């Protein structure tokens, strides 16, 4: 059973809606690009949180202080964007959700796409006052290696590997299904349409009522994007194996590979 905070009604926000909120300063916009890129230019009123800064946090308490410094309180509406097809932004948004923040979405385009549309950018940094944010860990959206190992015995659990196809063929967690992160996007948007996403799952034989666990190579960026892609079509029970395949290998857990892969295996979406 998922907690209320694991239910996401709108995983992404469109450009028109984001613009209107930015213009009246009713939203906290987080730019997840590198600091030097942010300093050159960014979307109007955005604050900067490079993913590396977030990943350096060694506890939820440390991480929540990063968000407090960005002026994010419990009731702050947050939109996150990047310039890497939504993967880094997804990891930041997921972390906010994990620590208990309920109102966070992804901008449905990248920074480059925003700029190509001729929308407002700036070099000015907003003046932000630190605030307080409560810590309410949401365990229902995270999978550990132990949880994953136990869940694999359940017939209604699906494990999705979001790495590149070749990486999957060489090594993967036994029983996982490969949906490369590149398959999640559509032209001009970081995620497929809902209908297209449902068709993708159907083509892989993945039921929408299953518990789905996503993973990628190391820190949960590519699989974070998959997490929100699944949430976009209303799948209620999705978890991110945040430490992903890197940890799985380090723990010397079982690993599978596909022998004698054909051209189709390599080129499959």
Where in the sequence are the language-model features?
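Flexible, polar/low-complexity N-terminal or interdomain linker segments that lie immediately upstream
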Residues: 1-40, 86, 108-170, 256-269
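Thiolate-centered catalytic microenvironments shared by cysteine-dependent enzyme domains
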Residues: 2-9, 54-143, 211, 216-245
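Conserved beta-strand scaffold positions in the cores of enzyme catalytic domains, especially
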Residues: 29, 46-48, 104-106, 159, ...
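Acidic/glycine-enriched edge-of-secondary-structure segments
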Residues: 44-58, 180-189
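Terminal peptide-recognition signature
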Residues: 46, 96, 176, 230, ...
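Append "and occasionally in soluble cytosolic enzymes with long acidic Gly/Pro-rich linkers
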Residues: 57-67, 193-208
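A mid-sequence, solvent-exposed acidic-amphipathic segment
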Residues: 151-200
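Cysteine-dependent PTP/DSP-like catalytic domain, specifically the C-terminal lobe
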Residues: 239-265
């Amino acid at each position: 059973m998922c907690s209320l905070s694991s239910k996401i009604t709108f995983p992404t926000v469109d450009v028109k809606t984001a613009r209107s909120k930015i213009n009246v300063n009713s939203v906290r916009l987080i730019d997840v690009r590198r600091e030097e890129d942010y300093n050159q230019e960014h979307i109007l009123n955005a604050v900067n949180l490079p993913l590396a800064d977030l990943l350096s946090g060694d506890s939820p308490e440390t991480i929540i202080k990063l968000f407090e410094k960005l002026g994010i309180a419990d009731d702050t509406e947050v939109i996150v964007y990047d310039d890497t097809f939504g993967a880094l932004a997804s990891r930041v948004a997921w972390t906010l959700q994990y620590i208990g923040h309920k109102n966070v979405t992804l901008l449905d385009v990248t920074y480059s796409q925003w700029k190509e549309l001729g929308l407002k950018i700036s070099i000015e940094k907003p003046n932000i006052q630190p605030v307080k944010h409560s810590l309410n860990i949401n365990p229902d959206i995270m999978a550990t290696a132990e949880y994953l190992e136990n869940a694999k015995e359940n017939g209604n659990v699906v494990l999705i590997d979001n790495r590149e196809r070749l990486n999957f063929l060489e090594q993967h967690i036994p029983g996982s299904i490969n949906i490369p992160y590149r398959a999640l996007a559509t032209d001009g948007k970081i995620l497929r349409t809902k209908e297209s996403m449902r068709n993708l799952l159907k083509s892989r034989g993945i039921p929408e009522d299953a518990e789905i666990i996503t993973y990628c190579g190391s820190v949960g960026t590519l699989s974070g994007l998959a997490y929100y892609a699944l949430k976009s079509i209303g799948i209620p029970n999705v978890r991110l194996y945040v430490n992903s395949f890197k940890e799985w290998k380090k723990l010397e857990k079982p690993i599978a590979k596909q022998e004698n892969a054909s051209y189709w295996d390599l080129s499959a979406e």
